[in-house]
Amino acid sequence: MALTLFDTDEYRPPVWKSYLYQLQQEAPHPRRITCTCEVENRPKYYGREFHGMISREAADQLLIVAEGSYLIRESQRQPGTYTLALRFGSQTRNFRLYYDGKHFVGEKRFESIHDLVTDGLITLYIETKAAEYIAKMTINPIYEHVGYTTLNREPAYKKHMPVLKETHDERDSTGQDGVSEKRLTSLVRRATLKENEQIPKYEKIHNFKVHTFRGPHWCEYCANFMWGLIAQGVKCADCGLNVHKQCSKMVPNDCKPDLKHVKKVYSCDLTTLVKAHTTKRPMVVDMCIREIESRGLNSEGLYRVSGFSDLIEDVKMAFDRDGEKADISVNMYEDINIITGALKLYFRDLPIPLITYDAYPKFIESAKIMDPDEQLETLHEALKLLPPAHCETLRYLMAHLKRVTLHEKENLMNAENLGIVFGPTLMRSPELDAMAALNDIRYQRLVVELLIKNEDILF
């Protein structure tokens, strides 16, 4: 049975925007120009990149070799002051350099000159290439979509319950009508929800502080990458919201202080998550797959059929709030499609997709090859480009999907159908062009289909 396109799995633009991340990857790398002779009176906090009292013209000649080249010189006009000379954009840039225990040319302080130059090259490159893009970052925020407030809301099955005043008659009622009144269905609960129950009861200004993020991080207001090595943005000290400095001015006053101890699972970089929890794979992947395999392998349309979106959001909230203690058992979520939906949502919300932007072209290339042996060889080479945590998670997922296909007679899901569902979920084109991304969907589907069919060979 072949499926063409599912209503619930049509192409959707990714939540997290990769353009600035791609630019950071492309930025020139630092290249230290060392002095070949001993320089008298060299400050102890500089290394062989210090060339003494040389002119701007002499520095320019030394740096002409490559983009990213740098050296430090002492000013001829103002002895005792120092200049960082840096090659960028085919010209030499000169910055007054300071040291107070750390190196700096502006607000940011660095432990080493190398880190200062690396961060500077990233900033110069991104601001040169994407000045207009950066100026418009705050125009279409995703803040309401990510919804930090959803982490603290009541679950769907609770928040729709009306506030009922208990009466003496209600407590003593044993008749069928009394039981029915107290056990309102979820549909009736939704119908009785009052509009004012959805309005926040108070406002609180976020307590933003400049923050250095370890590992890749994305702004939770505009969904763009937070570039640089240190002080890439600001973090709310009370609720943990991470945003660009310029985006912090646009965030509404909706800080929830009781979220400060929450460690997010969804929308967190995969490698960062597994390192933080010291696990081989993200807990949400392991727990969802175990639950699906324990009671859902024979479910018709597994992964194709959508679950109720409010309850999928509840599962996401449970993982973000409770981590590995999240209850996703049949007692909480009888419909297995809620769990499959939560797993697909986890992969869709990854800032860097499971099949990363760097590896994406190689995977697409493999799907276009007609010779089966060459195709598998290229696919094997593509897998080597994945970070270890991504590769291990992909291996585990493909082994699971292979087991799903063994129950095809019952669930009607073969490798081709699963490829249709998971292709755009696990892979996202690094290209900004929507048409190019749409054209790649058929190859994305084929990549996943090949990974499932050849799981035992490739992994």
Swiss-Prot record:
The modification Phosphothreonine is found at residues 192, 340. GO terms for molecular function: ephrin receptor binding; GTPase activator activity; zinc ion binding. Changing residue 223 to V: In DURS2; behaves as a dominant gain-of-function allele that increases CHN1 activity in vitro; appears to enhance membrane translocation and CHN1 activity by destabilizing the closed conformation of CHN1 protein in response to phorbol 12-myristate 13-acetate (PMA). Phosphorylated. Phosphorylation is EPHA4 kinase activity-dependent. Changing residue 313 to K: In DURS2; behaves as a dominant gain-of-function allele that increases CHN1 activity in vitro. In neurons in brain regions that are involved in learning and memory processes. It comes from the Eukaryota. Residues 49-135 form the SH2 domain. Gene3D superfamilies: 3.30.60.20, Rho GTPase activation protein, SH2 domain. GO terms for biological process: ephrin receptor signaling pathway; motor neuron axon guidance; regulation of axonogenesis; regulation of small GTPase mediated signal transduction. Changing residue 252 to Q: In DURS2; behaves as a dominant gain-of-function allele that increases CHN1 activity in vitro; appears to enhance membrane translocation and CHN1 activity by destabilizing the closed conformation of CHN1 protein in response to phorbol 12-myristate 13-acetate (PMA). The modification N-acetylalanine is found at residue 2. The record marks 304 as: Arginine finger. GO terms for cellular component: cytosol. Coiled coil: none annotated. A zinc finger (Phorbol-ester/DAG-type) spans 205-255. Keywords: Acetylation, Disease variant, GTPase activation, Metal-binding, Neurogenesis, Phosphoprotein, SH2 domain, Zinc, Zinc-finger. InterPro entries: C1-like_sf, Chimaerin_SH2, CHN1/CHN2, DAG/PE-bd, PE/DAG-bd, Rho-type_GAP, Rho_GTPase_activation_prot, RhoGAP_chimaerin. Residues 268-459 form the Rho-GAP domain. GTPase-activating protein for p21-rac and a phorbol ester receptor. Involved in the assembly of neuronal locomotor circuits as a direct effector of EPHA4 in axon guidance. It is linked to Duane retraction syndrome 2: A form of Duane retraction syndrome, a congenital eye movement disorder characterized by a failure of cranial nerve VI (the abducens nerve) to develop normally, resulting in restriction or absence of abduction, adduction or both, narrowing of the palpebral fissure, and retraction of the globe on attempted adduction. Undiagnosed in children, it can lead to amblyopia, a permanent uncorrectable loss of vision. Interacts with EPHA4; effector of EPHA4 in axon guidance linking EPHA4 activation to RAC1 regulation. This is N-chimaerin. It comes from Homo sapiens.
